[in-house]
């Protein structure tokens, strides 16, 4: 089974004019990370009973900006599309990968998952369309309840001393690999998967990762007062510290960090 991208001529009309059945998803709000696609049936369809768990051959599927779509069959991912547009579901074609902005990383994830699932040609009894929110998930506040040790280093003069720092701010994250996010975290949900199911856990892990991330910045001989102005360096250090827990195990990554001035510094050594 595969997806065929609709031609330019098809883009001018409505989905209802082009296909017997079609799936779409309205713009996903900031609190929804994944939502099941809504199935619409037109007068041209013979599937008048409208079984929501079957995707008919020739169905239309729309993907909007800020979304990634997958099709699952019996809980296994069989299609992925991260490029905005309108597509036709074709059961006679090979699986397709429209990776969009995710590039080769998404293709590689799909190939890995596809090896675990061979489609035998029979019509599945549970086929679903899911849409992922690929926009930045905003307004994740954080703060250090306890001081973090920070090594102030000046290699030129051979100086090194440890200070205690506290920091707070806001970060954003993105679903950087929807296939890992689905297979490792949310799975075959009935309707949608929202951020409140994981945000508390993410906040704890984010704060825990600040210690190694700030340690990496200390190696660059940055002083605590300089760090709020080094947002890109801090983001890279945080993603490195969270590589296993977030990127590899959940398919999410830090997008941006806004750090308030670091306060309450005390010299330890």
Task: Annotate the PLM regions.
Residues 1-166, 172-197, 254-256:
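Interfacial loop/beta elements and low-complexity acidic/Ser/Thr-rich segments
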Residues 268-269:
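Conserved small/polar residues in nucleotide/adenosyl-binding loops
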């Amino acid at each position: 089974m595969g997806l065929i991208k609709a031609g330019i001529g098809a883009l001018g009309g409505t989905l209802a004019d082009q296909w017997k059945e079609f799936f779409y998803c309205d713009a996903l709000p900031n609190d929804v990370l994944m939502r099941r696609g809504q199935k619409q049936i037109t007068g041209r369809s013979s599937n008048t009973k409208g079984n929501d768990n079957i995707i008919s051959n020739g169905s239309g599927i729309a993907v909007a900006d800020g979304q990634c779509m997958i099709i699952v069959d019996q809980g296994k991912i069989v299609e992925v599309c991260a490029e905005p547009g309108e597509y036709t579901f074709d059961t006679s074609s090979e699986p397709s990968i429209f990776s969009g902005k995710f590039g080769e990383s998404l293709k590689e994830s799909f190939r890995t998952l596809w090896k675990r699932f061979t489609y035998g040609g029979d019509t599945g009894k549970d086929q679903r369309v899911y849409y992922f929110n690929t926009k930045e998930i905003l307004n994740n506040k954080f703060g250090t309840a306890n001081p973090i040790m920070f090594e102030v280093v000046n290699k030129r003069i051979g100086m090194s001393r440890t200070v205690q720092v506290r920091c707070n701010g806001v970060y954003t994250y993105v679903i950087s690999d929807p296939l890992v996010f689905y297979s490792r975290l949310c799975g075959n949900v009935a309707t949608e998967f929202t951020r409140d199911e994981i945000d508390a856990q993410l906040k704890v892990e984010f704060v825990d990762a600040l210690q190694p991330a700030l340690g990496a910045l200390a190696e660059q001989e940055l002083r605590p007062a300089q760090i709020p102005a080094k947002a890109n360096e801090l983001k890279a250090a945080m993603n490195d510290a969270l590589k296993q827990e977030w990127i590899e195990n959940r398919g999410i990554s830090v997008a941006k960090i806004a750090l308030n001035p670091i306060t309450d510094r005390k010299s330890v050594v």
